[in-house]
Amino acid sequence: MSAIPDRAGYALVTGGGARLGAAMVRRLAADGWAVAIHYHHSATHAEALAQEIKSGGGRAVTLDGDLGALGSFADLFGRANAGWGFCSLLVNSASAFEYDDIATVSRATLQKLFAVNLHAPVLLARDFAAQLREGSKGLIVNVLDQKVFNLNPDFLSYTLTKTALEAATRLLAQAMAPSVRVCGIAPGLTLRSGEQTAEGFAAAHASTPLGFGSQPEDIAEALVFLAKVPSITGTTIVVDGGQHLQPRTRDVMFTYGIAPDAPVGKTGK
């Protein structure tokens, strides 16, 4: 029996209004999926993206929600289910990203990042299974980071959350089979973050073993690939130009474009 997600359902992409999430939304829509675009801070981008898809003949809706504070994740599905029936593809792309290290880590930062980057994907997986139509197959894809395979202590809380989510990907794949497959995609340096300069980003992007890093479109293609290959579950595809093969004692942005002692602000990933 095929484990390809039921195309009678729709795809929900958290953090789908901007950055990597938007690239995945566009690719899914181009592949014929009806897409629910979740956002929190990117309302203007999400609404424009939905209109772009609908203008091209596709189906899209937007869903607002703070994944760090939502009392019921089932409501997120319920709002889209009212028009489309059920969700058969969940992409956990939303991510909180903030610099800290062992000297600056705090309980507040840990709680905030774990709420969005781990608690939300796991609870969304639970509610995804509950609303999946009986007899249908589903797919959950967690967006991770090549850092989980190439550890360094920068962005300490963020790295801990993504490492935990990689483990959760394998655990959920065991727990949710055979009706739901669970996979991960681990991008490398794909978009500028924080205080990194354009020149520094370009240099870092070119420093991988392949001579180039990942593009948003590469991540989106990996997602479509996972949706179409029914025998893949419990594993993570690293899409990074080989960045994870280059051990570093500090995050790559401190090698290219940011002084080691420069302050690094909050940003999206």
Residue spans of the language-model regions?
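Substrate-binding pocket helix/loop in short-chain dehydrogenase/reductase
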Residues: D101-I102, T109-F114, A204
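Conserved NAD(P)H cofactor-binding loop of Rossmann-fold oxidoreductase domains
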Residues: S93-Y99, G242
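Conserved Rossmann-fold SDR core element
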Residues: E166, M176-T190, I232-V239
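C-terminal substrate-recognition "lid" of short-chain dehydrogenase/reductases
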Residues: E217-V239, H244-L245
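Conserved glycine-rich cofactor-binding loop
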Residues: Y10, G17-R19
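Catalytic loop of short-chain dehydrogenase/reductase
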Residues: L139-A177, L189, Q243
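A conserved structural motif in NAD(P)-dependent oxidoreductases
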Residues: T208-I219
